[in-house]
């Protein structure tokens, strides 16, 4: 009742969830070119996720799981569907999500175990996996009940709030929901006794249990979270928010007509990569002059990795700005003191030395 009244007053006064204002990129989120100038390790057009066991980096690419040996990928598993999420488990096993609808365990003592539903509800858009803190279970986020992983933009434009997080017990073969009713859950990670979950359409990271915000009012749509070797975490964001998109999200009749009559690639909506077509909805001299996109223009796509402390505070960030190409960052893992970043928008895996990042941004 109280929440309903709050939403009503927010819409009346244009505040809270109904506000079209965007927090600035400031402080630890101050823009830079760290991602845009990062060395490219590999180009994988179908890459979807990254994982590491501390010694090797693995990539989900199309229907395959690849091990990255320097700049040479080696296929180690292949499936009959697209791999939408991936993580390494203790004991040398892997967990993969296939087509967002099935979670499988590969190798180790739990080899062959799989799940297709949680709490009597089929899995639909599994987009992130992580081991529990004790290593006996598996955490996952199921982004949406209505839309598969590849239709994430449809979920945003439809006002989706059917995401959930779940925990799978590898020993008891059981599964339970730990959070539901989320505005597109996309990222999960244990943090001590707590569990952190990215809630993309709410622009925040929450803690499981009380569902309280850990990091909120972000100017981006957060995605996967992974641990950093020296403590803390890496949080990725697959695109940035804009006032125009926030306005469109409030205009229900316009948005529904746009979705009904216009091709999705021309929607006024976030994207994973920059567009070069003359039909794109955002043009003009304040955005592009003589074919050159200005770096301060409202971004249709963006690339961002945020370094979080153990308390969930932003320490610094790595950017590929509006005029860059390393956009649509959906995964970042640290292995052997290097940060591997997947920019899905351009299909590239970047590699940055962590020591150099710490020296540049922490001193």
What does each model-found stretch correspond to?
Residues 1-363:
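Sequence-structural signature of mature extracellular/luminal beta-sheet repeat domains
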């Amino acid at each position: 009742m109280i929440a309903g009244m709050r939403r009503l007053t927010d819409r009346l006064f244009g505040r809270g969830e109904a506000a079209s204002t965007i927090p600035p990129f400031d402080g630890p989120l101050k823009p830079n070119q760290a991602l845009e100038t990062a060395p490219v390790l590999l180009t994988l057009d179908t890459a979807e996720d990254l994982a590491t066991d501390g010694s090797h980096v693995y990539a989900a690419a199309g229907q395959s799981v690849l091990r990255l040996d320097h700049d040479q990928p080696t296929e180690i598993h292949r499936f009959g569907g697209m791999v939408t999420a991936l993580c390494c488990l203790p004991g040398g096993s892997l967990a993969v999500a296939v087509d967002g609808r099935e979670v499988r365990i590969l190798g180790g003592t739990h080899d062959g175990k799989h799940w297709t539903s949680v709490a009597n509800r089929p899995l639909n858009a599994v987009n992130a996996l992580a081991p529990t803190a004790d290593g006996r279970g598996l955490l996952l986020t199921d982004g949406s009940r209505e839309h598969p992983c590849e239709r994430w933009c449809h979920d945003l434009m439809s006002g989706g709030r059917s995401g959930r997080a779940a925990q799978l017990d590898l020993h008891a073969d059981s599964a339970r929901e730990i959070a539901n009713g989320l505005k597109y859950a996309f990222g999960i990670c244990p943090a001590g006794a707590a569990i952190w979950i990215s809630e993309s359409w709410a622009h925040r990271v929450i803690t499981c249990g009380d569902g309280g915000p850990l990091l909120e009012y972000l100017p981006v749509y957060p995605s996967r979270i992974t641990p950093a070797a020296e403590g803390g975490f890496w949080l990725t964001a697959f695109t940035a928010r804009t006032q125009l998109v926030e306005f469109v999200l409030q205009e229900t009749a316009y948005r529904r007509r746009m979705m009904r009559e216009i091709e999705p690639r021309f929607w006024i909506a976030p994207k994973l990569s920059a567009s070069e077509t003359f039909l794109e909805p955002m043009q003009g001299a304040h955005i592009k002059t003589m074919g050159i996109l200005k770096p301060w223009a409202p971004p249709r796509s963006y690339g961002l990795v945020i370094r979080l402390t153990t308390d969930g505070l932003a320490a610094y960030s790595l950017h590929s700005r509006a005029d860059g190409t390393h956009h649509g960052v959906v995964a970042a893992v640290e292995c052997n003191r290097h940060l591997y970043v997947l920019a899905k928008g351009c299909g590239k895996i970047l590699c940055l030395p962590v020591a150099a990042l710490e020296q540049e941004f922490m001193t």
